[in-house]
């Protein structure tokens, strides 16, 4: 007798479908017909009732949402002709709107900093989103910016004048400002402090000396491609070694490595060794290509035991590192 599919089975299947959809989304490929049919609620070609597809679609949405990639997986399904239930379709529209609003607000903040001689460095998702295929595909909850802490009070006054609520100021290595409907800015005075790994705090203490001036501005800074990647790895490991980090982190690695094909890995490996993250960098670099590469349908099936464990850990963590059950009622 055929075993009845349990919720755990369904979640597990949806997780691997999510990986396939993410790979298709960033590689610009079409998902397999069999996968699409599982989530198609209209014009179905199999004899299964549409309610089964609706249930699967809901689970896939919840799994994707837990990893903050629901806009990307939903967009891939939608572009392939799969009708999405209203909440999912709305989440895609919200992700696009949020990125547009963040971009406009960030431009105003940078203009203020330029006018007042304050150097600044956009971090993490602000940079990474540019390597995703379309607006809204790389979802973000906040904006991370490193800036000259000498001007922290001036920046605070500016943010308050713009209607922001000061959630945190001078209490940590970053100040936090929030404003409706979606704005959340984390303005970093430093990248790491002694509360993190001592070697990280020491390595990044004088980071300004390694920064490069952006084109067409006077105070906007950027990291060299290799240094940005190294910081990506350290930030990812901070969460990975703590409460966990979701699959979006592994996807970020893949997207960045696909965009930057001429990175100096001799330098990267040397610096990662200093930061005690060399093994994590290598393992994540290899794994992301096996999971999201265009031959992933074959390479996922041939993962070694340690690679499977690492992938399971990524999949078992929400984007902010919760190791609790992701899919709830």
Residue ranges and their predicted role:
Residues 2-141, 147-329:
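Conserved NTP-donor binding/palm subdomain of two-metal-ion nucleotidyltransferases/polymerases, i.e.
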């Amino acid at each position: 007798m055929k075993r009845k599919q349990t919720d755990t089975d369904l979640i597990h299947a949806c997780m691997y479908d999510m990986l396939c959809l993410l790979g298709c989304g960033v590689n610009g490929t079409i998902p397999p017909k069999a996968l699409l049919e599982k989530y198609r609620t209209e014009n179905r070609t199999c004899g299964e009732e549409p309610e089964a597809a609706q249930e699967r679609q809901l689970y896939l949405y919840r799994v994707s949402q837990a990893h903050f990639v629901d806009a990307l997986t939903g967009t891939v399904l939608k572009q392939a002709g799969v009708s999405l239930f209203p909440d999912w379709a709305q989440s895609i529209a919200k992700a696009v709107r949020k990125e547009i609003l963040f971009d406009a607000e960030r431009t105003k903040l940078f203009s203020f900093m330029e006018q007042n001689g304050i150097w600044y460095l956009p971090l993490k998702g602000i940079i990474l989103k540019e390597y995703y295929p379309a607006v809204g595909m790389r979802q973000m909850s906040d904006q991370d910016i490193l800036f000259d802490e000498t001007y922290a009070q001036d920046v605070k006054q500016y943010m308050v004048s713009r209607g922001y609520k000061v959630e945190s100021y001078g209490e940590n290595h970053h100040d936090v400002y929030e404003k409706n409907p979606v704005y959340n800015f984390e303005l970093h005075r430093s990248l790491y402090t002694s509360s993190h790994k001592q070697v990280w705090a020491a390595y990044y203490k004088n980071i300004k000396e390694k920064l490069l001036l952006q084109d067409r501005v006077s105070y906007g800074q950027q990291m060299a491609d290799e240094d940005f990647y190294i910081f990506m790895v350290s930030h990812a490991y901070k969460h990975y070694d703590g409460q966990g980090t979701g699959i979006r982190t592994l996807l970020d690695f893949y997207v960045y490595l696909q965009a930057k094909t001429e990175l100096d890995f001799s330098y990267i490996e040397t610096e990662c060794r200093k930061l005690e993250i060399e093994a994590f960098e290598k393992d994540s670099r290899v794994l992301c290509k096996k999971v999201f590469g265009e031959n992933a349908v074959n390479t996922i099936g041939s993962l070694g035991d340690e690679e499977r464990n690492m992938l399971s850990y990524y999949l078992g963590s929400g984007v902010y590192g919760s190791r609790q059950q992701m899919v709830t009622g």
